[in-house]
């Protein structure tokens, strides 16, 4: 099965499995923007929320960057479709990019972003109409436990 990992899922997989994450995600797909989203999330957790130290954040980001060498890093092929989905579902263009890539690759979208999951589920009719198909959603726990 093919997987597109969004930043929330990739970050949670790395946090849970560390370098052992490679076994679960090798050959999966992610977007060019993913490392930046993860870096921003780690910055926020270290700087604003004080959940982790800068050292912990740096270690996690370094692990992510090493794992990215074993993933297919891609971009959506159809930017107009991406914008249309962002508009219809009222989500960010970033989030819509993950949906479009999953659709284009006939892959499952792995996300732990509750808000995104809810929007996709609530907007399934709109997605069906715009894409002509549906996108299967999974969580990082489903990947970790597989």
Task: Tell where the protein language model's regions lie, with residue ranges.
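Active-site neighborhoods of divalent-metal-dependent phosphate/nucleic-acid chemistry enzymes
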Residues: 70-119
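Short, well-structured N-terminal submotif of metal-dependent ribonuclease cores
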Residues: 1-35, 50-55
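A general structural signal for well-ordered alpha-helical segments in protein cores
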Residues: 35, 39, 61, 79-82
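Acidic, PIN/NYN-like endoribonuclease modules and their adjacent C-terminal/linker elements
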Residues: 111-146
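Short glycine/serine- and small hydrophobic-enriched flexible loop segments
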Residues: 40-47, 103-104
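Alpha-helical elements of the RecA-like P-loop NTPase motor core of helicases
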Residues: 12, 40, 118
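Helix-adjacent hinge/juxtasegments
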Residues: 50-55, 65-76
């Amino acid at each position: 099965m093919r997987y597109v990992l969004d930043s929330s899922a990739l970050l949670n997989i790395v946090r849970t499995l560390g370098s052992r994450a490679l076994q679960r995600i090798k050959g999966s797909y992610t977007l060019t923007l993913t490392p930046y989203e993860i870096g921003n999330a780690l910055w926020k957790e270290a700087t604003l929320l004080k959940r982790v130290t800068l050292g912990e954040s740096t270690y996690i980001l370094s692990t992510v960057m090493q794992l990215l060498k074993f993933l297919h890093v891609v971009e959506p092929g159809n930017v107009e479709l991406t914008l249309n989905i962002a508009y219809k579902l009222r989500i960010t263009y970033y989030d819509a990019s993950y949906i479009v890539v999953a659709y284009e690759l006939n892959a499952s979208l792995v996300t732990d972003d509750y808000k995104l999951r809810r929007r996709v589920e609530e907007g399934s009719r709109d997605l069906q109409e715009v894409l002509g198909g549906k996108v299967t959603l999974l969580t990082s726990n489903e990947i970790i436990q597989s």
